[in-house]
């Protein structure tokens, strides 16, 4: 799949957002014959952080009757806010708030260096969470708790404006050679893309620690309180490869995530289990398989990238794959990473594909009632 330009998430955990937007920009570039362009990651990130703050505060209200050492309450206070995420965040935010070109809301120091901002907002959210629990324990009615939460979100909004800038409500833009028009973020998205990100895409997982050909849902794994939890079909790796190859052959990029730190040769941009011989060096073996690594929290989905190419042998079987990364053009192989099929088997976890590339038998699995997994499941890991 052809691409134009490499993006750079800088010192932030926004790979999930860059990846989702890179998938969408490739569609827009192809559709309108555009040169290199980007959507504003900062615009989407602003509302992502605001919605996550609301998700946390409402979660605190919902669990206010439980003790502080309840596992869900503990999990909430350990995860008030992060800059990481998944494809659910891409769909949750864009479906509600739309998109803008990067020129309409550029990056800031804090959007490119999210650590301090996220820590400060997270600290404030924990303080607010305690206040909401105290109010609920004192018998404050739900309608009054909602008012308190809304006021708290006003504080978060101000913190986000100070660090990321205020989101644009309207802007003027045109295609090259076209007449400039005024858009809202939602009207811009609907006119130029308009994809139903919630219903037109299928989230696929390769998790050998769970039963295959089942639908799973991870609780609280979403970016909006009224959004959709990460709900996926768990498939054998060969099934996922067939879907990915069909998409690439049709020049359609995919959201893809993996455990990128394993056996990465960053200078060559190569992911291969044979890159390093740790067993000879240490005089021992490392025998856990993929299932065991998942069960022991030794491996999981840590980074999202855009799956864009595959090298097939004469029999049509994959030999290696290529992804567009978001670490800048100087990283890896001209901003890309290449992975052997052997590495793909061991460290690939998630692919998000358009429904038209997914067999009917897999789509039928989505009709099952999902098996609900807790928020602290090994497969709930923000991609950063």
Residues covered by each model-derived region:
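N-terminal regions that are enriched for targeting/export leaders
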Residues: 1-5
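Active-site nucleophilic cysteine motif
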Residues: 10-24, 81-88, 303
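Solvent-exposed loop/turn segments at secondary-structure junctions
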Residues: 22-23, 49-52, 101, 110, ...
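Papain-like cysteine protease catalytic cores
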Residues: 41-174
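Active-site signature of cysteine proteases
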Residues: 140-384
